[in-house]
Amino acid sequence: MVFVYKPVKKQPHRDKPQGRKVEVVKQGDRYVLLRNGEPYFIKGGAGYEHYGRLSKYGGNSIRVWHTDNAQQVLDSAQKYGLTVTLGLWMAREREGFNYYDKELVAQQTEHLKEIVLKYKDHPALLMWGVGNELYAESSNVKVWDAVNQVAQMIKEVDPDHPTTTTVMNVPEKEVSLIVKKCPALDVLSINAFGSMHNLPEDLARSDWKGPYIISEFGARGYWEAFYTWWMAPIEQTSSEKAEFARQRYEQSVLADLKHCLGSYVFMWGNKQEVTPTWFSLMSEQGEETALVSEMRRFWGDTVVINQPPYIAYLKLDNKFAFDQIYLRPEQNFEATVFAYDPEQDSLQLHWEVLPEAARQDGNADKQKKPAVVQQTLLKQDGNRQWLRTPAKEGPYRLYVYIRDGQNNLATANVPFYVTHNPLK
């Protein structure tokens, strides 16, 4: 394999902005992130859109995973007074990269050096994210030597911005290797969802004793969810996600201010990952779910917020998702959603049936929402919807989207399996 990259175009010197000095210091028994000498606690969102809203709601930072469109991202962040943790994408071995190949690793480091030199003086830059969950599906410990090589390179060409790398939860072996092999890293970033509430204790038992950032959190991950018998993960309602994330934010971020430098909620925007709603804090049209309201409160927004609708539960054929819903093809069934609006706003319900997504891979960018299955929806009456199951056997989901006319949205879905031979 040959690592090929395009030379990075340098900014004209006359347009070169003035950067900001960012550093991590220890004050007494507490780690503090300083930006131009002032304490800077990260109140962020991970994503590529709605930066103006994030700033308006009290957020101060965004996180992205790679440098595609980095100039646009940094400029947009600067426009709204936000900072950026800018990801430097490092290839993974499962993608064919070999970290035993010293020449290949050197090429990658040189490529990343060009990127660092291009963006290091941008005033919106907060820190560098060196790779993302690099150990996933790989056991080659040489990857951490490469991470340290990149981090050390950054310290030489850009001493004004800290470096971090990202792991999922607190994998004991990998964290130990990071401590031993990556002394040039300043901060550990952790993507945590279901186990986020245990982070302070897990980190205390690990070899990492320095500062950390929660680089992704939000709904329970689909890899942590309960599954149907046909291996479809059961998704929380948007109301459940907000409460789930609120509890974990309080139990980790707010409970460990001596080590935690802040967090990035995931996903600030909309993303198809298993479903179009699993991690999306907003709809494709920008309507906001309950987790946005929770983050506004944590970020200190004092504006009185019109709350999104609340979904208590969704049933299909009088069954919950946990009841393993098998339905015969081309038969009529009834679905019911139980919901209310805190301000008693009038609610509009939209239903749709989608086939189960073929991929359950968060690392696959730009996944497309499956096409809506046509001719499945029959009569709707208030909170009830009748549907006709598809003729084709296989896994599907019934979705409901509830709007209050105030740019708020509540979502829920229930997986079901169409078959001529139901198991129950």
PLM-predicted stretches and their roles:
Residues E23, Q27, R35-P39, G44, ...:
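Substrate-binding clefts and catalytic carboxylate motifs of secreted carbohydrate-active enzymes
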Residues M1-K21:
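Bacterial Sec-dependent signal peptides at the C-terminal "C-region" and cleavage site
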Residues R388-K392:
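Residue-level recognition of secondary-structure-to-loop junctions
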Residues G28, L34, E38-L185, N198, ...:
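Active-site mouth of glycoside hydrolases
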Residues N383-L387:
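Short strand-edge motifs at loop-to-beta-strand transitions and within beta-strands
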Residues N169, K173-W223, Y227-W230:
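Aromatic- and acid-rich polysaccharide-binding/catalytic face
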Residues V418-K424:
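Extracellular interdomain linker/stem segments of modular secreted and single-pass surface proteins
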